[in-house]
Structure formats: C-alpha cells, structure tokens
Amino acid sequence: MDISRAEQRILHLLAQGGRIEIIRSETKKIEAASCFTRDGWLYPGFDLTLFRKLKHLKAIKSSGGHPYRITERGLRLVRAQLDNR
C-alpha cells in the first residue's frame, strides 16, 4: 500500500521514537493533534486530517491514555530513510 509523503515523514518520526499527543474537547472529541520528535521538538507539518488518515490505516495506536505511537503495521508501511544525524 502506498502512503503519501506527509504520512511517510510522520511515520518515520514515530519510528525513531516520536509521539502524537491529542487535545480533547469537553465532549471527548479530538480537537487538535501535535506530533513531537524524540527530542521533544514540535513537528510543524502535522494536522488533524493527517492524524485521521494514519489512524484509519491503523499505523498509530494509543493504549492506556498514553500518547499515540507507531504500530507494527505502521513500521511495515514506512520505507527506510537515511538519517543524517
């Protein structure tokens, strides 16, 4: 299955140890989602529609009220990239 470039970037960040944190309204609906790198930096190219796409693909999952992390299916979807650290 092919995924978009934006989805690929987010999955790569999550595979390196990043996380997605959400903000819920009083009615328990998701209002906003933010993607953080493993170093704690906020990734600017992430929005609610991208979050919903990744959740629909079952590439991310949250358990026990913790931030969203990449799943094994998400790891299979992400292609290897050279990390220039």
Swiss-Prot record:
One Pfam family per UniProt: YjhX_toxin
Highest taxon of source: Bacteria
Similarity comment: Belongs to the UPF0386 family.
HAMAP family: UPF0386 (MF_00827)
Name of the protein in question: UPF0386 protein Arad_1912
Gene source species: Rhizobium rhizogenes (strain K84 / ATCC BAA-868)
